Regions:
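NAD(P)-binding Rossmann-fold cofactor-contacting core
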Residues: 166-190
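Glycine-rich Rossmann-fold phosphate-binding loop(s) that bind the pyrophosphate
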Residues: 151-153
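Adenosine-phosphate binding glycine-rich loop
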Residues: 7-10, 248-363
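Residues at the starts of beta-strands that form the adenosine-phosphate
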Residues: 146, 170-171, 196, 253
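N-terminal ligand-binding/catalytic initiation module
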Residues: 1-125, 131-133, 143, 329-333, ...
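Short helix-loop-beta connector
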Residues: 140-146, 168, 230-231
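Rossmann-like adenosine-cofactor binding region
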Residues: 194-285
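N-terminal Rossmann-fold NAD(P) dinucleotide-binding loop
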Residues: 156-157
Length: 363
């Protein structure tokens, strides 16, 4: 039978600590040559919505150790509104019932069957933050106690969980442009983690004196400036442009979860003039590619760092930077397999016939 799991099931089955451990193992597999990642692919078309475009995304990866291959797909309607003076990338819940469409398909490389279909919402935010946690665990100072968090959305919340899972944080200072939102975020995360979470009036105030600086926003531009960065800080971002050029220049070394050149992604779009100026992943990746070329002498892969092929932090005064990048298929494969195994053991989820997803005729 093929198991169908939703976001609520994933939240019930997956802790941040276990997510981080699963991702660590996956990145070690990658470094040992027993994992495979296909480039992320984004395809764009116009839609009937005048201020939005259609986007279809796929990411794939497999792990020989677990005997699985995962594919994550998203069918999205994307807009770029100006919010609080900043251009944001916002997905619209345009599916029937005001819902989003994002799915993870997990296949067995032994029996070939489709093991599970998982909605990707909660697993997505966990694997992004979990990778952030892996980087902080191995690169941030051991005595890190204070974190600055720029962002107060769904991805920022799990970033807080991840940092608290790998360092005994006592305080998180959070900034986002909307005062009510950052206050509500601080109250919620403080209750969840049992630590002090303080809303900051501006990003500079949040960063001042922090041991870890994490960016987790949907801004299309830089939100942290190098002038605010102090010796000993560990910086971590989801997209490379969240930290400005000076942050990268000041960093003693940079850890990246995946390739920062053009091998990590591909974009496709129709020739419709309405798509001429949209912000594709290629446009966002231009920043990452440029910084890779400029700073490649001090960039190492997370997989190499975990295997001891490159040194970790050697000095408490070093400034380190973790570039999360655009995601890898092995992240979905490792975490989805963990969730699937636990769901099977607990009898959670809905089963449907596996035969619905196979055929007797030659494909």
């Amino acid at each position: 039978m093929t198991l169908v799991l939703n976001d609520e099931h994933v939240a019930q089955l997956l802790s941040m600590k276990d997510c981080i451990a699963a991702l660590e193992d996956a990145f070690r597999d990658m470094g040992q040559g027993t994992a495979v990642n296909a480039p992320r692919r984004d395809s764009f078309m116009v839609s009937s919505h005048p201020d939005a475009h259609y986007s279809f995304k796929t990411i794939e990866g497999g792990l020989e150790r677990l005997g699985v291959m995962a594919q994550r797909i998203n069918s999205d309607l994307v807009t770029y509104p100006m919010i609080d003076g900043v251009t944001r990338r916002v997905k619209v819940p345009a599916a029937p019932g005001n819902r989003y469409v994002g799915l993870i398909f997990l296949y067995s490389s032994e029996t070939l069957e489709l093991l599970t279909i998982i909605t990707d919402g909660h697993l997505q935010r966990m694997r992004v933050a979990g990778t952030t946690g892996v980087g902080a665990k191995h690169v941030a100072r051991e005595d890190a106690r204070t974190a600055a968090l720029l962002g107060s959305g769904w991805q920022a919340e799990t970033a807080a969980w991840a940092l608290a899972a790998v360092r005994p944080l006592s305080t998180i200072r959070v900034f986002s442009p909307n005062p009510e939102r950052r206050q509500a975020f601080a109250t919620k995360v403080a209750a969840t983690l049992g630590i002090e979470v303080v809303p900051a009036a501006d990003p500079k105030e949040a960063i001042r004196g922090a041991d870890i600086v994490a960016c987790a926003s949907n801004s299309s531009g830089s939100i942290a400036q190098g002038a605010w960065i102090e010796p000993g800080m560990h910086l971590t971002c989801i997209l490379p442009n969240e930290f400005d050029e000076e942050c990268w220049r000041k960093s003693d070394f940079v850890v990246s979860s995946g390739p920062m050149d053009e091998t990590g992604f591909a974009d496709y779009k129709t020739g419709n003039p309405r798509l001429a100026d949209i912000e594709t992943m290629t446009g966002q990746h231009d920043v990452e590619r440029e910084r890779f070329q400029r700073y490649k002498a001090k960039i190492c892969m997370l997989s190499d760092l975990l295997l001891g092929k490159t040194p970790k932090r050697t000095d408490a005064s070093q400034i380190t930077l973790m570039n999360k990048g655009f995601g890898l298929g092995i992240e979905f494969a490792s975490v989805a397999k963990l969730v699937y195994d636990r769901a099977c053991a607990a009898g959670i989820g809905e089963e449907i016939p596996t035969e619905w997803f196979s055929q007797t005729s030659h494909p």
